[in-house]
A protein has these predicted regions:
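Active-/binding-site microenvironments in catalytic and ligand-binding cores
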Residues: 1-228
Length: 228
């Protein structure tokens, strides 16, 4: 069964600190007598919705989206950790949690349950973030790890913005771990086995990151609303 793990982009898409907006306006409409429906999409910031941060987002000479080959975005070893969080604090993983992760992991998913607040102000102005030290712990133990994703709006906690800059540089620095923010994890749980995952980024020339579509192939019998 295949599932979308990325949200639909619309004008209600939350943004970090509620500082940006996506607007979608019709450009031409068949109802007006023209030959096709077209729209204008205006992103006031490319980092909104389910999106990817590349090293160039925080590192001047860092890699950009186009520096990655297609196979880099295809993952066969995915692992999900459930760590329920209800406040905008910094997150790290215990020794036991880190030891539970398979040694060959390529894409690590952290489900906090914070996605339940996505329609509330709390989601964008009291969000958790990741401790910078976690990047070093993961990189040291899991040499095949290429991406980390989670169900809150940014790697940077709104309450710990200075530390968030350190965290971004820690994850996106040497031997970078791509950061996938604002994933739709409403319908995935630790019991689900991931067979594969495809990360499809919007490929732009000056790619410091941007919206992504994520499709996961899961070994599970039930069906949910985001099934492909």
């Amino acid at each position: 069964m295949k599932l979308f793990l990325s949200y639909i982009l619309d004008e209600n898409t939350p943004t970090y600190g509620d500082r940006d907006k996506l607007t979608i306006t019709p450009k031409s409409q068949i109802i007006d007598g023209v030959g096709a429906n077209t729209s204008t999409l205006n992103f006031s910031n490319n980092h909104m919705g389910t999106h990817m941060d590349t090293p160039y987002h925080f590192i001047e000479n860092g890699k950009k989206t186009l520096d990655y080959k297609a196979e880099y975005f295809c993952f066969d070893h995915i692992y999900l950790i459930e760590k329920l969080i209800d406040t905008g604090d910094l997150i790290t993983l215990s020794i036991n949690e880190i030891n539970s992760i398979p040694s060959d992991v390529e894409f690590l998913i952290i489900k906090t349950g914070y996605c339940k607040y996505r329609s509330l102000d709390k989601y964008h102005n009291d969000n958790p973030g990741l401790e910078s030290s976690l990047a070093y712990d993961l990189r040291k133990k899991f040499p095949k790890l290429r991406a980390i994703g989670f169900d809150f709006i940014s790697l940077t906690s709104w309450n710990h913005r200075e530390h968030g800059r350190l965290s971004h540089r820690a994850f996106l620095g040497e031997n970078d771990i791509l950061v996938i923010e604002d994933m739709d994890l409403n319908n995935v749980y630790k019991e689900i086995k991931f067979d594969s995952l495809i990360l499809a980024p919007l490929r732009t020339l000056d790619g410091n990151g941007g919206p992504v579509t994520i499709i996961a192939d899961v070994n599970n019998k039930y069906k949910k609303q985001n099934e492909v």
